[in-house]
């Protein structure tokens, strides 16, 4: 169970780093929000899911 928690936290950190870089790039691109909003929504949905997963796994470990 601990390894699953550690992998979930690592995935959350990686996803956060990717979103930190990609969201400003999406808004600065010529297509802007209209062309890339599906990518932003997918990344945000993944991030929210990982936050809940880390919270659930943390409650099971503690």
UniProtKB/Swiss-Prot annotation:
Its main location: plastid. It is found in: Plastid, Chloroplast thylakoid membrane. GO terms for biological process: photosynthesis; photosystem II stabilization. Keywords: Chloroplast, Membrane, Photosynthesis, Photosystem II, Plastid, Reaction center, Thylakoid, Transmembrane, Transmembrane helix. The chain crosses the membrane at residues 8-28, 41-61. Gene3D superfamilies: Photosystem II PsbZ, reaction centre. InterPro entries: PSII_PsbZ, PSII_PsbZ_sf. The keyword Heme does not apply. Pfam families: Ycf9. It is a multi-pass membrane protein. GO terms for cellular component: chloroplast thylakoid membrane; photosystem II reaction center. Belongs to the PsbZ family. PSII is composed of 1 copy each of membrane proteins PsbA, PsbB, PsbC, PsbD, PsbE, PsbF, PsbH, PsbI, PsbJ, PsbK, PsbL, PsbM, PsbT, PsbY, PsbZ, Psb30/Ycf12, at least 3 peripheral proteins of the oxygen-evolving complex and a large number of cofactors. It forms dimeric complexes. May control the interaction of photosystem II (PSII) cores with the light-harvesting antenna, regulates electron flow through the 2 photosystem reaction centers. PSII is a light-driven water plastoquinone oxidoreductase, using light energy to abstract electrons from H(2)O, generating a proton gradient subsequently used for ATP formation. PANTHER family: PHOTOSYSTEM II REACTION CENTER PROTEIN Z (PTHR34971:SF2). HAMAP family: PSII_PsbZ. This is Photosystem II reaction center protein Z. It comes from Cucumis sativus.
């Amino acid at each position: 169970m601990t390894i699953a928690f550690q992998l979930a936290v690592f995935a959350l950190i990686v996803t956060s780093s990717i979103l930190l870089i990609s969201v400003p790039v999406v808004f600065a691109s010529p297509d802007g929000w209209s062309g890339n909003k599906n990518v932003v929504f997918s990344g945000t949905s993944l991030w929210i899911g990982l936050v809940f997963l880390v919270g659930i796994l943390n409650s099971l470990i503690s």
